[in-house]
Protein backbone atom coordinates (compact mmCIF):
# COMPACT_ATOMS: atom_id res chain seq x y z
CA UNK A 1 0.00 0.00 0.00
CA UNK A 2 1.46 3.31 -1.10
CA UNK A 3 0.51 6.62 0.51
CA UNK A 4 -0.04 8.15 -2.93
CA UNK A 5 -1.50 6.42 -5.94
CA UNK A 6 0.73 6.70 -8.96
CA UNK A 7 -0.95 6.79 -12.32
CA UNK A 8 0.81 6.83 -15.65
CA UNK A 9 1.02 10.38 -17.07
CA UNK A 10 -0.13 9.17 -20.51
CA UNK A 11 -3.29 7.76 -18.94
CA UNK A 12 -3.95 11.04 -17.13
CA UNK A 13 -3.41 13.01 -20.35
CA UNK A 14 -5.73 10.66 -22.27
CA UNK A 15 -8.43 11.01 -19.61
CA UNK A 16 -8.11 14.80 -19.61
CA UNK A 17 -8.41 14.80 -23.40
CA UNK A 18 -11.47 12.52 -23.20
CA UNK A 19 -13.41 14.78 -20.80
CA UNK A 20 -12.28 17.89 -22.66
CA UNK A 21 -13.70 16.49 -25.90
CA UNK A 22 -17.11 15.57 -24.48
CA UNK A 23 -19.61 17.68 -26.39
CA UNK A 24 -22.50 19.49 -24.77
CA UNK A 25 -24.73 18.14 -27.53
CA UNK A 26 -23.93 14.60 -26.34
CA UNK A 27 -25.08 15.36 -22.80
CA UNK A 28 -28.40 13.90 -21.75
CA UNK A 29 -28.94 16.14 -18.72
CA UNK A 30 -28.21 19.69 -17.56
CA UNK A 31 -27.39 19.49 -13.88
CA UNK A 32 -26.27 21.59 -10.93
CA UNK A 33 -24.28 20.81 -7.79
CA UNK A 34 -24.68 22.01 -4.21
CA UNK A 35 -21.62 21.71 -1.97
CA UNK A 36 -19.94 23.49 0.92
CA UNK A 37 -18.24 26.75 -0.02
CA UNK A 38 -14.70 26.09 -1.30
CA UNK A 39 -15.26 22.41 -2.20
CA UNK A 40 -13.00 21.07 -4.93
CA UNK A 41 -14.23 17.51 -5.34
CA UNK A 42 -17.77 18.08 -6.59
CA UNK A 43 -19.04 14.54 -6.83
CA UNK A 44 -22.81 14.73 -6.99
CA UNK A 45 -25.28 16.74 -9.00
CA UNK A 46 -29.00 16.95 -9.63
CA UNK A 47 -31.59 17.78 -12.17
CA UNK A 48 -35.30 18.37 -11.72
CA UNK A 49 -37.68 18.50 -14.63
CA UNK A 50 -41.43 18.69 -14.87
CA UNK A 51 -42.45 16.73 -17.94
CA UNK A 52 -45.72 16.40 -19.82
CA UNK A 53 -48.78 15.03 -17.99
CA UNK A 54 -47.51 16.23 -14.58
CA UNK A 55 -44.65 13.77 -14.52
CA UNK A 56 -41.80 14.90 -12.27
CA UNK A 57 -38.30 13.67 -13.05
CA UNK A 58 -35.50 13.78 -10.52
CA UNK A 59 -31.96 12.86 -11.49
CA UNK A 60 -29.11 12.19 -9.08
CA UNK A 61 -25.78 12.16 -10.88
CA UNK A 62 -22.69 10.79 -9.15
CA UNK A 63 -19.13 11.29 -10.35
CA UNK A 64 -17.75 7.83 -11.00
CA UNK A 65 -13.95 7.62 -10.96
CA UNK A 66 -14.12 3.90 -11.65
CA UNK A 67 -15.16 4.77 -15.22
CA UNK A 68 -11.58 6.03 -15.57
CA UNK A 69 -9.69 4.02 -12.97
CA UNK A 70 -10.92 0.43 -13.41
CA UNK A 71 -7.40 -0.95 -13.39
CA UNK A 72 -6.83 0.66 -9.97
CA UNK A 73 -10.01 -0.73 -8.38
CA UNK A 74 -8.17 -3.10 -6.01
CA UNK A 75 -5.99 -0.31 -4.65
CA UNK A 76 -8.95 2.08 -4.36
CA UNK A 77 -10.98 -0.49 -2.42
CA UNK A 78 -8.06 -1.00 -0.04
CA UNK A 79 -7.89 2.74 0.58
CA UNK A 80 -11.48 2.75 1.75
CA UNK A 81 -12.41 6.46 1.83
CA UNK A 82 -11.51 10.10 1.48
CA UNK A 83 -10.34 11.59 4.77
CA UNK A 84 -11.45 15.07 5.85
CA UNK A 85 -9.24 16.46 8.61
CA UNK A 86 -8.05 20.04 8.62
CA UNK A 87 -6.72 19.09 5.16
CA UNK A 88 -8.62 17.08 2.58
CA UNK A 89 -6.86 13.79 1.73
CA UNK A 90 -8.53 12.38 -1.37
CA UNK A 91 -9.07 8.69 -1.96
CA UNK A 92 -7.85 9.05 -5.54
CA UNK A 93 -5.29 11.43 -7.04
CA UNK A 94 -6.33 15.10 -6.99
CA UNK A 95 -6.24 15.34 -10.80
CA UNK A 96 -9.17 12.88 -10.84
CA UNK A 97 -11.11 13.96 -7.76
CA UNK A 98 -10.80 17.71 -8.42
CA UNK A 99 -10.69 17.82 -12.24
CA UNK A 100 -11.33 14.81 -14.49
CA UNK A 101 -14.18 13.39 -12.39
CA UNK A 102 -15.28 16.54 -10.57
CA UNK A 103 -18.58 18.00 -11.73
CA UNK A 104 -17.19 21.42 -12.60
CA UNK A 105 -19.39 24.26 -13.82
CA UNK A 106 -19.75 24.64 -17.58
CA UNK A 107 -18.08 21.25 -18.17
CA UNK A 108 -19.32 17.98 -19.61
CA UNK A 109 -18.75 14.89 -17.50
CA UNK A 110 -19.54 11.18 -17.30
CA UNK A 111 -21.58 10.05 -14.29
CA UNK A 112 -23.56 7.19 -12.91
CA UNK A 113 -27.11 8.48 -12.81
CA UNK A 114 -30.27 7.48 -11.02
CA UNK A 115 -33.34 8.82 -12.80
CA UNK A 116 -36.67 8.67 -10.97
CA UNK A 117 -40.07 9.65 -12.32
CA UNK A 118 -43.10 10.40 -10.16
CA UNK A 119 -46.70 11.15 -10.99
CA UNK A 120 -48.60 13.92 -9.21
CA UNK A 121 -49.70 11.42 -6.51
CA UNK A 122 -46.00 10.87 -5.71
CA UNK A 123 -46.01 7.33 -7.00
CA UNK A 124 -42.72 6.28 -8.53
CA UNK A 125 -43.62 5.31 -12.08
CA UNK A 126 -40.14 4.96 -13.53
CA UNK A 127 -36.60 4.40 -12.42
CA UNK A 128 -33.35 3.87 -14.23
CA UNK A 129 -29.71 3.55 -13.20
CA UNK A 130 -27.25 4.19 -15.97
CA UNK A 131 -23.98 5.71 -17.08
CA UNK A 132 -24.69 9.09 -18.62
CA UNK A 133 -23.14 12.25 -19.97
CA UNK A 134 -24.08 15.46 -18.19
CA UNK A 135 -23.48 19.18 -18.62
CA UNK A 136 -22.93 21.04 -15.36
CA UNK A 137 -24.84 24.32 -15.60
CA UNK A 138 -23.92 25.69 -12.19
CA UNK A 139 -21.93 24.90 -9.04
CA UNK A 140 -23.68 26.32 -5.98
CA UNK A 141 -22.68 26.51 -2.37
CA UNK A 142 -25.54 25.97 0.08
CA UNK A 143 -26.09 29.64 0.92
CA UNK A 144 -26.09 30.81 -2.70
CA UNK A 145 -28.52 28.07 -3.73
CA UNK A 146 -30.90 29.00 -0.93
CA UNK A 147 -30.69 32.72 -1.77
CA UNK A 148 -31.38 32.19 -5.48
CA UNK A 149 -33.79 29.27 -5.54
CA UNK A 150 -35.35 28.32 -2.24
CA UNK A 151 -38.29 30.72 -2.48
CA UNK A 152 -38.85 30.32 -6.23
CA UNK A 153 -42.20 28.90 -7.35
CA UNK A 154 -40.45 26.14 -9.25
CA UNK A 155 -38.42 25.00 -6.26
CA UNK A 156 -41.40 25.25 -3.90
CA UNK A 157 -43.29 22.90 -6.22
CA UNK A 158 -40.47 20.37 -5.78
CA UNK A 159 -40.48 20.83 -2.01
CA UNK A 160 -44.23 20.17 -1.95
CA UNK A 161 -43.73 17.06 -4.06
CA UNK A 162 -41.03 15.77 -1.71
CA UNK A 163 -43.23 16.48 1.34
CA UNK A 164 -46.13 14.57 -0.25
CA UNK A 165 -43.79 11.69 -1.05
CA UNK A 166 -42.38 11.68 2.49
CA UNK A 167 -45.86 11.76 4.02
CA UNK A 168 -47.06 8.96 1.72
CA UNK A 169 -44.22 6.79 3.05
CA UNK A 170 -45.16 7.59 6.66
CA UNK A 171 -48.73 6.49 5.92
CA UNK A 172 -47.60 3.17 4.40
Predicted feature locations:
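Boundary/activation segment at the start of structured domains
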Residues: 1-3
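Electropositive polyanion-binding surfaces
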Residues: 8-172
